[in-house]
A protein has these predicted regions:
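Short, amphipathic alpha-helical segments
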Residues: 98, 102, 122-126, 144-155
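A contiguous catalytic/ligand-binding core that recognizes phosphate-bearing ligands
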Residues: 107-123, 129, 142-144
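Short, positively charged loop/turn segments that connect secondary-structure elements
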Residues: 51, 119, 133-153
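Eukaryotic partner-binding/assembly regions in large regulatory complexes
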Residues: 1-114
């Protein structure tokens, strides 16, 4: 059985609500990530970001969340895009982000919900940092992460919630 490690992929894109909605509008069933990139780039919809950033959003965020291993999430979300309220759509994006990012999923299930169930109303930066430190020292990352990476990922985890 292959061991799945935590990665830093989450830092490639937080939120991305508007970008995801726009990409869902551009995406067609059967498109590869490269085809989606070319279509999105040609559309001019993403003129406020570089082509490299658009490619990263598609490859590191959109595809893992909504296209892999199969494009069923993108198919469903495309049908719901702009037709359900923003809060509900954000919750669906949240779920697919957690499914694609193991560290985020575990943060939610092992820390966020435990604290919420215990009556806490907020998490601190230190709570998030300790979670990431335990993960790196506990063998959940392929390599030990630098202090900068730990700080950045801790902040990202907290900001999504």
């Amino acid at each position: 059985m292959e061991h799945t490690y935590y990665t830093t992929q989450l830092q490639a894109g937080l939120g991305l609500i508007e970008e995801t909605q726009l990409l869902l509008s551009e995406w067609q069933f059967g498109m590869s990530t490269q085809e989606l990139f070319q279509t999105a780039l040609a559309s001019g919809t993403f003129s406020n970001i570089t082509a490299r950033r658009l490619r990263n959003i598609i490859a590191e965020c959109f595809a893992p969340r909504y296209l892999n291993p199969k494009p069923q999430p993108a198919t469903w979300l495309r049908q719901l895009n702009y037709s359900i309220n923003a809060s509900s759509l954000k919750q669906l994006f949240f779920i697919y982000t957690a499914r694609a990012n193991l560290i985020f999923r575990d943060f939610i299930t092992e820390l966020y919900w435990e604290r919420y169930a215990a009556g806490y109303t907020e998490l601190s930066n230190e709570d998030s940092r300790e979670f990431v430190l335990r993960a790196t020292s506990g063998g959940k990352t392929k390599n030990l992460w630098s202090d900068t990476t730990i700080k950045r990922l801790s902040s990202y985890l907290l900001s999504i919630c």
